[in-house]
Amino acid sequence: LVSIGFILLNLYFVVKKDSLIVNALPVLLGVFLLALFSFDKLIWFVAFFAPLSLPLSEIIPSFSFDMYLPTEPLLFGILILFLLKVIHERKFDRDILLHPVSMAIYINLIWIFLTSLTSTMPVVSFKFLLARMWFVVCLYLLTAKIFKSGKKMEQYVWLYLIAFIVVVFYATYRHWGYGLFNKQAAHYVVSPFYNDHTSYGAAVAIYLPFSVLFAFSKVYSWKFRRVALVVLGILVMAFVLSY
């Protein structure tokens, strides 16, 4: 019955509304179930899709607002679910909540809130505060809890790297068409995944040390280090071509 209902609803939206939006429902349901039973799996999902996210303006240019899909809606959803979970369970890791870094972040958030009240563009300011909050919850509070296991930190890095290498090949292929020594081309070949070569180069620089560690640390097997060495070579190439 559920399947028949989904098919009929999908047909209605395709025929009457010329829209495929109903096809997103199974994905949304899957994400909701992931969040319900395992926050860390949802964080892995965000880590993998972060480099591959596309701005909404690239898909629907007529929209008056912009966001990166699918990561920013996911981060917002994680924020809401996290707050509901904390309210329901009335607990979270106190070591993380009361850490000096956490305290500094709280002061920053309070300051943003106070300045948003007196802002000449309050809507923009509160949107910025909301975005800051979902980044803090997902990429600080939850990851700090998950990363208590070193192995999970490695998984997070590798998920990002695998997706990021796809972007590197895409950017390099486009750059090749303009000439690899064309510095001006480096500004736009990374679009639409990155705004310009600066943010792209910064992402490469952040993950280069991890690749060096994976490639040369004897903690890892020789097979693993060979794969990491290839990844390191790709990132070095990307760093050079990012100009």
Regions found by a protein language model. Give the residues of each.
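Alpha-helical transmembrane segments of multi-pass inner-membrane proteins
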Residues: 2-10, 27-32, 79, 105-117, ...
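Transmembrane alpha-helical core residues of multi-pass small-molecule transporters
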Residues: 49-50, 131, 163
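Hydrophobic alpha-helical transmembrane segments of multi-pass membrane proteins
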Residues: 32, 126-130, 143
